[in-house]
C-alpha cells in the first residue's frame, strides 16, 4: 500500500511516499544524558497531545484572511476540543514556512494568517495561544519547521520583501517544487536558531517542537544541489551523506543547548518519521522495509535519543497493526528499546487522520484500530503517552475513533505536569 503520511497531507505531495513504509531501531549500549545536563520540570504521567497544523491551513486558521476575532475563536475551539477529549498538550505550528505566527524580530508574518506573507493579522496568535492554553490547563509546545521556506514555489523573489531568504537567496535550495534553506551553510544554521529562539525567549512556551522535516524527502528525478556548500564545508567527511547528517546533528545539539539556556523550563522534542534504519541495512534497525530517516533524510534520530539531545521523541508511527512493511506492533517496541536507559520520554504519534470509513485499508475502516494501538503500547513501560494528528480530526471525529480512545483509555483528565 502506498504511504501518504503527514508530509503528503501537509504538502500535497501525493506520490512521494508511494514506495515507503516504516519502522526504526535501537542498540543496547548505555545512553548519554550528557547532551542535556541538569533537569527539566517533570513530564506528564501520561502525555496526551495533538498537533495543530497551520501550513496550508490544514487545521488552523481554517482559511487565510479571517479576521482576528474569527481566528482566535477557531483556535479556542480547538483548545476546547483538546480538553473535551481529555488531552493535556497541544503542538501549535508557529513557524510553518520560515514565517511567523507572532510579531517576530527576524521573519515576516505568516501567509497562512492573512493570505499574504508579511501582513500583520492584527493580533498576536502565539501570545494569545499560550495564555488561552494555560487557562485551560493545557501545555503549549511551539512547533517550528527549521528549513522549509516555501511550500508551493521555488522563487525567493515571491517571498515577502523583508524575508531573509529573499535577501539571501544563496541560502536557499530549490527542490521538488519547494524552497528550502540549505542545512549545509553555517550561517543558515545560526539564523534559523535565532529565528526560533526569538519566540522561545519571549513567550512562556512549555516546549519547543520539531516534526519530520530536515533534508527534504526524496523526489524521483530531483537533485538537492548543495555542491557548493559541500565543497566549502565538507572536508573531513568520508561521504556527503555523513556531512549532511552532521549538519542536522549539529543543529539539533546546538538548539538543545540554547533552549535550555534561554528557557530552562521548556522541553525540546522532535516528531520524526518513524523509521531510523531498516534491519536489512543495519542490524540495529527495525524489521521494516521503508524509507529511513538516517539514509534518506540525513536525520540520525537514534543518536539524538541516545545522546540525550532531546527531552522527548514522538515517532510518527502512522501504520496499522499488521502492516506488511511497517507494522505498528514492531515499531513501538523498537522505539521502546531505543529510549530504554535514557532520560528521553517516548510518546507515540498516532494517525487519527487515517481513520476513515472510506479507507482502502480494512484496519483504518475500523474505529477501534486506534484504541488497539494504545492497548498494545501499554505493554511497554517506556511509552509514556500518545499524540494525535491532527486537531481537526480530534474535534470533528467523523469516524468515532477518538471517542473510542477516550472511552477505552482516558477515563479521567490528566494534568500536563
Label the model's feature ranges.
Residues 244-251, 266-333, 359-375:
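Extracellular glycoside hydrolase catalytic/binding regions
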